[in-house]
Amino acid sequence: MTDVLKAEDVEAAADKAKEVGAFDANTTNTTGAKTKGDVFTSFNVDDFSVPRGRDEDWRFTPLRRLNGLHDGSFPGEHAPNPVTADIPEGTSGVHVEEVPADDDRLRAAGAPVDRVGAQVFASLQRGTVLTIDDNTVVDGDITLTFTGTGPDTTSFGALAVVAGEHTEANVVLRFEGHGNYADFHSYSIGTGAHVNVAIIDDMEDDAVHLANEQLRL
């Protein structure tokens, strides 16, 4: 036999849940969003509150192990992690640039969704832009390797992947080494493009790596 819930039963249950504090329809998470489709974003670190263990987006994160990346108490800043590029031999139409922190392409896909991502742009010294020209088909992997600056150091990075129309490419992002590292990935993908991105996080056990990602099609 099947039980049928009436509308008034559902409403009564919802009212009861509110009474006991199960949820509050007007409660927002630390990003200021009521739903995942309404996430607050900003490049300004001061627009975000410091995450707490009871915040919904952070309650499963051991904040003490983030070494201050979430609240600004991280160890002294150092230069961005060195980046090396491995592009298949004979490939044309693929460009890797080191750019200043104010390069618009680093922000083209949107703003960070949390305080750590915004801290990247507050502390960023330079970034990396990978551009794949229109109609370029890459045979093999484009690999970018980011190497930590060392134990008890902190660095920040930003990567923009700009894929033109009707491109085909596989991009591998590899992270290795020691240190605290926060970065932001901006993906701007053109019409008809097919781009696969694989992330290999092979940093040492004493390292901390946090990343924000935004995609624009």
Positions of predicted regions on the chain:
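Glycine-rich and polybasic anion-binding loops at the starts of cofactor/ligand-binding domains
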Residues: 1-217
